[in-house]
Amino acid sequence: MTLWVLGLNHQTAPVDLRERAAFAGDALPRALDSLRTLPQVREAALLSTCNRTELYAMADDPQTLVAWLDMHAPGLSGYLYQHRDAEAVRHLFRVATGLDSMVLGEPQILGQVKDAWAVARAHGALGSGLDRLFQQTFSVAKRARTDTRVGANPVSVASTAVRLAQESFARLNESTVLLVGAGETIELAAKHLSEGRVRRLLIANRTLAHAQTLATQHGGVALPLTELDRHLAEADVVFSATAAREPVVTRVQVEQALRTRKRKPMLLFDLAVPRDIEASVAELSDAYLYTVDDLERAVEDNRRSRREAADQAEAIIDLQVARYVETLQANERQAPLKRLRAFGDSTRDELLAKARQQLSNGKPADEVLEQLAHALTNRLLHPPTAALRDAALNNDLDLTSAADRLFPEKPGYRHPPVATPIVRTDDANPAP
């Protein structure tokens, strides 16, 4: 089995394609259940955020994974990147550290990777291979953030949106801000807004209790999402980030709100993928809409300023990838020995139990021992005997040579190690 990662992100695919590729809400567990039915896939995990959808899998053939993703969202194949084995390990380490994020070093992605691991494990989609990889990923990401400043003073998409709002409204503290949703992105936006102060903070969410919790923490007013129409016109700035599959803020709603506001400008930030705000809202006069793709350009300055710390983190990741791959290769080299030992132990235990039963039934000890020795010899030597017979028929000299070393003619004899040529350095110019 090979480790594969297939995915798309903000660098390879536009937002409309990313929103079709996203696995929101209950779609993620269902997708994992679907992957588990594929005979070519042994283990799988899905990472789905506003900026990326990635499939991590232990599988024989990546085309099976490509076909599965294309069935989920037709047209993805031309936008997918693909990594295997060591490069797949490197990719996950970089993602979890925030080196592959729109906002370099963002802290939220590590939590999202942990969520992907937890969901995959809860649904039985993880095996020892991916589980070990994710555990190592968490350790590497923590070290990279501790040993470098890649995560210092992190700038998130939410904080970037708040900064743009502050630049657009010189007196944001005299404005009304509406937050739609109550997830992590909206929590971050609320935190940054409360630090800068706003005149009034409205928080609308499908689950009112979640909105109330956030409102209590940041001095806002909680609203059920069903009352969005009534309060949209009050908002000078709107931040929206829900997990809805369809837009929660429509063009019709914004048009009505602008009429009520008597064409007073409204600034809207759509921080969700799939998008929360209908794209055609950007066509309206006095409505200024930013999507996550627009914000990528706004955070490029931050990316440049943190490149030195990122280079240090990359060096840590390079070292950790090499160590991880070395450990995997060592385990692979030990695997035949472990299988051989397990085969010998299980054979011994099975035949010994049978011999003890025969003794307890009164069978003569000499006869039992004779049968035990004969059975052990046959059972243990049958696999190598069959393999050597095939090797002789197929002229497999490598296997027959290995057998000579494993089973020498003289019992107890050990073959000498393979000689290594010695290069003399004391006679650099020998006489002709």
Curated annotation (Swiss-Prot):
InterPro entries: 4pyrrol_synth_GluRdtase, 4pyrrol_synth_GluRdtase_dimer, 4pyrrol_synth_GluRdtase_N, GluRdtase_CS, GluRdtase_dimer_dom_sf, GluRdtase_N_sf, NAD(P)-bd_dom_sf, Shikm_DH/Glu-tRNA_Rdtase. Coiled coil: none annotated. Pathway: Porphyrin-containing compound metabolism; protoporphyrin-IX biosynthesis; 5-aminolevulinate from L-glutamyl-tRNA(Glu): step 1/2. One of its GO terms (molecular function) is glutamyl-tRNA reductase activity. NCBIfam families: hemA. Catalyzes the NADPH-dependent reduction of glutamyl-tRNA(Glu) to glutamate 1-semialdehyde (GSA). Homodimer. This is Glutamyl-tRNA reductase. It comes from Xanthomonas campestris pv. campestris (strain B100).
